[in-house]
């Protein structure tokens, strides 16, 4: 029982006393679970002031620009760790020992192959389908091939499903790309890292060996780390909502992918690149900056600012450094990249952007990196989904471990009152 209480006074001087819960970090939370029995609900469209669950996985302080995974700062993880170690931390809550990490990595590596019949499913899609449409369908279909681990009440089944999803996502993501460009699928290699294996499956062909560039490999690994989890966002909440009904893990992750596909969520880096294409040249930047400052103009700079972070996005700091490393390594000369770098310079120095805290965010830099690597913008959200899969799994598993209720939001009904029905049709 919480020590602190909150009181709500309703019409007629009826007072409801509610517990105030305290977390390890962050805001206090008023426990409103008893409100329904009192005949009232809360109204919070978008759940911006509602804690839908209790979680020990990720903490965000948007005002201070803090992002912690199991208590570890994101910048330390991105700099001193690798994606699979971060996956272990998210899934199990603690840093792995060397022995635990080696076993974890081996298990993931040995499950990267997908059932051969799944490769045939790709051919049911049009070649010009958006890769996210294909990714949604293929992920949901996994339940038809791996139905020996679908008992969500069995911890071992949940762990097996977690390994399968984490292992097979890069394979399926790369196959989405290969299918879209008409090239043969490239199978995974056990001698490569998680990020290196993905790059090899993306760019290798039967004609020549693809040598994984270590700078690009590290950049991809960092992209995966920085997108691994972000607390109760739209797609994670979707996974939890789907999971609350007892749905199988593959269906839940497919639901998360569908939510992530939205341009307001996972499509932000793709939208940022399209904005750069619209600007097209450095000489056009002043005009677009002027429009961005005009509140009556519909144009908005994509990839700047963040709904949660009122300060600098902590992920963007690492991503900016990585972006410049990649551009230096590749020596790329590209009009859009020049536009991006000039926009970055303006945003970091223009008083308007500084005052509004419209700093370049992780989507801005990740889009530039992926483009420089030769990855088309249609694949950006697929890579985001691949990275976020471990976060979705961690939340899905936590929900089952801690106990859950089926999600059933309420509504503020503003439709017709009860009325009689008399058909106007001739009978």
Swiss-Prot record:
Homohexamer. Pfam families: Citrate_synt. GO terms for molecular function: citrate (Si)-synthase activity. Its EC number is 2.3.3.16. NCBIfam families: cit_synth_I, PRK05614.1. Belongs to the citrate synthase family. The keyword Iron does not apply. Citrate synthase is found in nearly all cells capable of oxidative metabolism. It is an enzyme of class 2 (transferase). Keywords: Allosteric enzyme, Transferase, Tricarboxylic acid cycle. The active site is at 306, 363. This is Citrate synthase. PROSITE patterns: CITRATE_SYNTHASE. Allosterically inhibited by NADH. It comes from the Bacteria. Coiled coil: none annotated. GO terms for cellular component: cytoplasm.
